[in-house]
Amino acid sequence: MPSNIHSVAKVHRVACIPGDGIGVDITEAATRVLNTLSTVLKTFEFDFTTFDWSSKAYLERGWYMPPDGLDQLKKYDVIYFGAVGWPDVPDHISLWSLILPIRKALNQYVNVRPTSILPGTKSPLADCKREDLDWVIVRENSEGEYSGQGGISHEHSEHAVATEVSIFTQVGIERIMRFAFDTARSRPRKKLTMVTKSNAQRHGMVLWDKVFYQVAKDYPDVSTDKMLVDAMTVRMVLHPTSLDTIVATNLHADILSDLAAALSGSIGIAPSSNLDPTRKNPSMFEPIHGSAPDIAGKGIANPIGAFWSAAEMVRWLGETEAADGLMKAISNVTAAGVKTKDLGGSEDTKGVTNAVCKEIEKLFGGGE
C-alpha cells in the first residue's frame, strides 16, 4: 500500500489480475502510468492488489481463482485485467475458469470497445483518415453465444455429439440495447447500427431484432440501421465513415471488435470495459489483445491498449480530468512517433511507457 495513502482525498482500490504472457508486461506498464497520474495530480490514490490467477499457477495448483475469488473481487472498486491464455492449458479451460466467470458473476453485462486511429498512426485502409474511423462497439457480455450451455455426448466414441446453445433473453437483450442507444445518443452523430444474423438464426436473433426495434421507439433522436454480421465486415472495410455506434451479440462483437482494432492500426491499441452499469459490482478493464506467448517477457508488447483501458477505468471511477489527460498523453506520444513495431515504430514497452509517464508529468506537473 502506498505510504502516502492517508493524505489524499480519495483512494481507489484496484484488483490487478495480470494473467498470462504479455498480460504481465502490460499490467506492470499500466500500473506505473496510473501511479504517475495519481502522483502528479495529487487528488486521488490507487491501492493496487495483485492476484496471481495465471495459467502457470493453475498448472501448479489446479485452479485459477480460489473458491472465494469472486467474493474477494467484490471488495474492490474496479478490476484491471491483463490477458489470459497459455499453450499448456486448453483455451476453453482458461477462459471459463477466469475471465468469463468474472464477467457473469459480477453482472458485467456490457462490454464497450471504442475504436479510433491515434495521431501518428495510420489505418491499413487506403485513404482512411483519422476522422473517418471513430466507432464504439457495444457488446452483449453475459449471454448469447457464450452462455456456456451445452455438452458433448459419446465423447470418446466415433459418434460424438456436441451442442453449444445460445441463450437470448428479453431482459438481457433490452438492457444492452438501452445501453447502446444511450451511448449513441451521447455521441455527436446519434447513430446506432444493430448487427444480427436473423436471416439464418430464426429464434434468438429474431428476438434480438424485435427488442431492438421496440427499444428504438424510446429514442426517436437516434438514427438506426440493421446489418447482417457478414455484410457488416464488408461495410467496416469499404465504408468506415458510415458507422458510429454499433451493438452486437457476444460472439459477433467479439469478432467485429478485433477487425475494428486491426483497421485502426493494431490490435495492440484497443481497449475494452466490462461494465456493471448498476455499479453494484466492480467493473473490469482490459486491452482486447491476447496473451501473445511468442513475445511474452521480451519487453516489446504494445502497451497502448493497456493505457487506453486504464484511462477508461479512471473515467469510470469519476476522475474525468485524469482520464482526459491520460488520453492526451497517449495521443501526444504516438503523434511524436514513439511507437512499438506493430504501429511502425521502433520503441519497446518500456520506451513507450517512459514517454507516456513523461508526457503526463508535462501536462499536469509543468515538466519539460
Residues covered by each model-derived region:
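Short glycine-rich or small-residue beta-strand-to-loop segments that form or flank ligand, phosphate
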Residues: 13-22, 80-85, 192-198, 308-315
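N-terminal beta-loop-helix "entrance" segment that forms/cooperates
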Residues: 43-66, 236
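Glycine-rich phosphate/nucleotide-binding loop
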Residues: 57, 235-336
